[in-house]
Amino acid sequence: MGKSKLDAVLKEKTQAKKPIFVPYIMAGDGGIDNLNKRIQFLEEAGASAVELGIPFSDPVADGPVIQDAGQRALANKTTIGSVLEALESEKSQRNIPVVLMTYINPVWKYGFEQFARDCSQAGVDGIIIPDIPMEEEDDVASSLTQHDIAFIRLAAMTSTEDRLERIAKRSEGFLYAVSVTGTTGERAQHENDAFHFLEKLKQISHVPVLAGFGISTAERARELSAACDGVVVGSKIVQLFEQGDEDGIHSLIRESIGEKVI
C-alpha cells in the first residue's frame, strides 16, 4: 500500500519493458457512486495506475474538457472527503495504484497532516499538486513521506537544466513530464522537441518518466512511450466516459500499450 505499492507496480512494467499507461478521471464526474466502478473498469482494461482528479473551482492546469468535468463533479457536491470515503470503502478490493491530483489550496484548508493521514487510510498511493512551487513544498512533502505516499513532481519543458535536475532528484513514484506547453487537452500539433525533452529526463530521473498533457491517440501514446516509460492520458479518457464510450477507452488503453484489441 502507498508509495511502495506504486513503486512495485511501475518497476514491474519497466523491467518487463512494457509501456506504462495511466488514465486520468475526474472524481465525482458521473457521480461519486460510480467512482470505484470506473477505477475497476480501467484496471481491467489494462491501466497501470489511475490518476484521480479532485474538482476545484480554479483549476489552473486543466484544459476545457477536464474543467467541464470538474464543474460537473462540483455540481454533484464532490469533495476531498467524499472521494476519500469512497476510495476507503473498497480499498481491500482494489489492486491498482491510485494517484490523486489536486491543488494546494484545498489541501492547505484540509490540513497537510490530516490530508496525508486520510489519504493513507483510503489507500491512496501517490499525490500530484501541480501548483505548488518546489521551494514551498517541504511541509506537505514531509506529511506525505510520513504516511508512505509518493509525492509525484511535474517537470516542464520551460524549466532550466538546474531546476529539472532538482525536480528529478525529488520526484517519487514517477516523474510527470509536461510534454507540451500550456494546459491539458488534445493538441493538433505536438512540439517536436518533446522527444528530446523526454530523453533528457530519462537520463536524470531515478524513477519512471511518464509523458502527459495533450495525448489523445494510441499512436501518439506509443510514440512518446518509445522515448520514456509511458504516458498519462486525461482529456480523451474523460471525454470518452462522458460519451459513454467504454469500448473506446478499452481500445485506447490496449492499443497504447501495444496490445491487440479483440
UniProtKB/Swiss-Prot annotation:
Disulphide connectivity of cysteines: none
Active site residues according to the UniProt entry: E51 (proton acceptor), D62 (proton acceptor)
Functional pathway: Amino-acid biosynthesis; L-tryptophan biosynthesis; L-tryptophan from chorismate: step 5/5
GO CC annotation: cytosol
Known EC number: 4.2.1.20
Keyword Lyase: yes
Superkingdom per UniProt: Bacteria
Keywords: Amino-acid biosynthesis, Aromatic amino acid biosynthesis, Lyase, Tryptophan biosynthesis
Pfam family, one: Trp_syntA
Quaternary structure and partners: Tetramer of two alpha and two beta chains.
Similarity comment: family membership: Belongs to the TrpA family.
Function according to Swiss-Prot or TrEMBL: The alpha subunit is responsible for the aldol cleavage of indoleglycerol phosphate to indole and glyceraldehyde 3-phosphate.
Identification of the protein by name: Tryptophan synthase alpha chain
Organism: Oceanobacillus iheyensis (strain DSM 14371 / CIP 107618 / JCM 11309 / KCTC 3954 / HTE831)
